[in-house]
UniProtKB/Swiss-Prot annotation:
This is Tyrosine--tRNA ligase. A motif ('HIGH' region) lies at residues 41-50. Pfam families: SYY_C-terminal (PF22421), tRNA-synt_1b (PF00579). Its EC number is 6.1.1.1.
Length: 430
């Protein structure tokens, strides 16, 4: 018997709370259901923290339902106070539209808009709203007493910053979005982060009061690592889905560096691999668990950037850190290349250097020439000037940059010239 998509989402760790749980399960067991999630266009790119809602829409589509990805081009002009301790900077319409374009392109990598999925921008119906008519027709359905009890408002009302009137309107606008999509697409389900519970319930109530219709909500848990760090954050900031902000290789390495305790959970959330295979990963450790991390990285990078980029990132990792043969029975449904993986270079060329020399620092152009990454110091200068020199996969942006002990990570420094020429520096034992 095919599993209901609600059961799938629960099993894989997507769900924190639902409204009318049994009714919702019955609804999703029947005919096609239209469901939506809103995406806030405060930046031109989504990041890894947005993957839970994106993947949930993809699961809905795979189960035969119709996902609606709503870019908040209209609500983005107001700003959502949910989960914020101070008022967001208001964006211009031009900023919001530009950001919305970038977000739509990224969503298309996960959701097939040629097979029934819908992309919408709420600016299409919110920007032209007439204020008096909106208050008369819909404002009467909202209780201020109930609104200020919502967690999203209560936290702001208790803060020193307070809650602006423009933000107070946000709940009404999001509720109206749900009503509009209910009218236009028969949309009965809204999903969102745990901080959206009050806004989702407001939309459900508006549909019931204004149309006498039934609607439902699902919220997702806040995903943190086992160390308690918010998902998608690193010491360098957010991990973006835009390859211009976070390269496919950096994206791949983000997943490779997953903490051991998080691997099964992240495989369930961020890949489509079967749970019966993922559950076996819980018993792995050491080298076998590291191979599971490689598969997680490959699958996640394939979804975000395509298979070619994932293969390129995998090969770069093999060339840099050494190849590992991946057993056929480890997460067997993964599309990761298994044959030939062990034929990659065992390691990159390595130079042993004395600590005292790196303590002082060596000019990058000098070192690139010395270890053979460039044919001469002049060639090395040209390479650096063109942005083709890297230390630990970070572009060297200055002619004067010196390679030093500060660059040492895990007892080594990885230098790169261009896309594929790597060299490792390690310290002598003296």
């Amino acid at each position: 018997m095919k599993m209901n998509v609600l059961q799938t989402l629960k099993e894989r760790g997507f769900i924190e709370q639902t409204t009318h749980d049994q009714e919702l399960e019955d609804l999703l067991s029947g005919e096609q259901v239209s469901c939506y999630i809103g995406f806030d266009p405060t930046a031109s790119s989504l990041h890894v923290g947005s993957l839970v809602p994106i993947m949930s829409l993809a699961h809905m589509q795979r189960a035969g339902h119709r996902p609606i990805a709503l870019v908040g081009g209209g609500t983005g002009l107001v700003g959502d106070p949910s989960g914020k301790t101070e008022m967001r900077k208001l964006l211009t319409l031009e900023d919001v539209n530009n950001n919305a374009e970038g977000i739509r392109a990224q969503l298309a990598r996960f959701i097939d808009f040629d097979k029934g999925a819908v992309q919408e921008n709420n600016a299409n119906w919110l920007v032209g709203l007439k204020y008096i008519e909106f208050l008369r027709d819909f404002g009467r359905h909202f209780s201020v007493n109930r609104m200020i009890k919502a967690e999203s408002y209560r936290m702001r009302l208790e803060s020193e910053e307070g809650l602006s009137f423009i933000e107070f309107n946000y709940m009404l606008l999001q509720a109206y979005d749900f009503l509009h999509l209910f009218n236009e697409y028969g949309c009965q389900l809204q999903m969102g982060g745990s901080d959206q519970w009050g806004n989702i319930v407001a939309g459900i109530d508006l549909i019931r009061r204004a149309k006498g219709g039934s609607a439902y909500g699902i919220t997702f848990p806040l995903i943190t690592t086992s160390a308690g760090i918010k998902m998608g954050k690193t010491h360098k900031g957010a991990v973006w889905l835009d390859p211009e902000r976070t390269s496919p290789y950096e994206y791949f390495q983000f997943w490779v560096n997953t903490h051991d305790d998080d691997v099964p959970r992240f495989l369930a959330l961020f890949t489509f691999l079967p749970m019966e295979q993922i559950n076996k990963v819980k018993d792995l450790d050491g080298a076998e668990l590291n191979l599971a991390k490689t598969i997680l990285a490959f699958e996640a990078t394939t979804l975000a950037h395509g298979r070619d980029q994932a293969v390129g990132a995998l090969e770069a990792a093999y060339n840099m850190f050494g190849a590992r043969e991946i057993p056929a029975d480890l997460l067997a449904d993964s599309s990761i290349p298994r044959e030939g993986a062990a034929k990659a270079e065992d390691s990159v060329p390595t130079t042993v250097m004395e600590q005292a020399r790196l303590q002082e620092g060596v000019p990058a152009f000098e070192l690139f020439d010395e270890i053979g990454l460039c044919a001469s110091r002049g060639a090395a200068r040209r390479l650096l000037g063109q942005g083709g020199g890297y230390v630990n996969n970070e572009r060297i942006d200055s002619f004067d940059y010196k390679i030093s002990l500060v660059d040492m990570k895990d007892n080594e420094i990885i230098l790169r010239a261009g896309k594929k020429n790597y060299h490792r520096l390690v310290l002598s034992e003296k």
